[in-house]
């Protein structure tokens, strides 16, 4: 690859980094807004989260197109291949993060506040939302900085997220058993619990791809 072509390729890789980081920040903002809407019952804020999801979907398609163009335009060397492969994998997780924020916002639109408080898990869901939000934000920061330490911290915190999911699920199941007439609201809260657990999983996925980007190793397998 000639010097001028290499410079152009590096500029395109840098632009890819910028696009992916911007999409990640937008997804993190969607989680934050969705959880604020849940706490406050702000239906306008919830609707804005839902409306912005299409923008993140568009960003996903643009990034995927750019990755494929980079693959086709040049024969990437190992480091470039890792960067483009990481972007292709991460963009899917980021898009799903935004989808789950939108799903939480959708539930908020029809969730009855008094009924939700009666189930008794809202404070735990708020706390779990904080954990999931920080995991996502830190995973994106780990990517931007190519920071293995931050990536490892995200992966380690997944145990806390999973433990909260399990405990909240059991509390909701016990409530439904005792109050079958209130099952609909309780099931809505269970779905929020599940979406938050998935947010943690997607943050871990991103962190693992950061490790791959830096080391060429993903999980237990050397790839590139």
Annotate each predicted stretch with a short phrase.
Residues 1-224:
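Cytosolic, long alpha-helical scaffolding segments
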């Amino acid at each position: 690859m000639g010097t001028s072509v290499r410079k152009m390729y590096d500029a395109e890789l840098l632009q890819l980094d910028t696009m992916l980081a911007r999409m990640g920040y937008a997804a993190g903002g969607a989680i934050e807004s969705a959880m604020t809407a849940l706490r406050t019952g702000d239906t306008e804020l919830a609707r804005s989260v839902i409306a912005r999801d299409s923008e993140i979907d568009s960003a996903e398609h643009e990034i995927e197109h750019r990755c494929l163009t980079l693959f086709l335009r040049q024969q990437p060397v190992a480091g470039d291949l890792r960067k483009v492969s990481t972007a292709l994998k991460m963009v899917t997780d980021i898009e799903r993060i935004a989808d789950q924020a939108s799903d939480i916002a959708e539930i908020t639109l029809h969730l009855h506040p008094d009924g939700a408080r009666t189930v008794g898990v809202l404070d735990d869901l708020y706390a779990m939302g904080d954990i999931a939000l920080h995991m996502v934000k830190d995973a994106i920061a780990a990517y931007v900085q190519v920071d293995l330490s931050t990536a490892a911290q995200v992966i380690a915190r997944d145990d806390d997220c999973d433990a909260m999911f399990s405990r909240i699920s059991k509390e909701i199941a016990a409530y439904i058993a005792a109050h079958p007439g209130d099952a609909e609201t309780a099931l809505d809260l269970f779905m929020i619990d599940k979406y938050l657990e998935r947010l943690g999983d997607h943050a871990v996925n991103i962190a693992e791809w950061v490790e791959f980007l830096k080391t060429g190793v993903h999980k237990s397998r050397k790839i590139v």
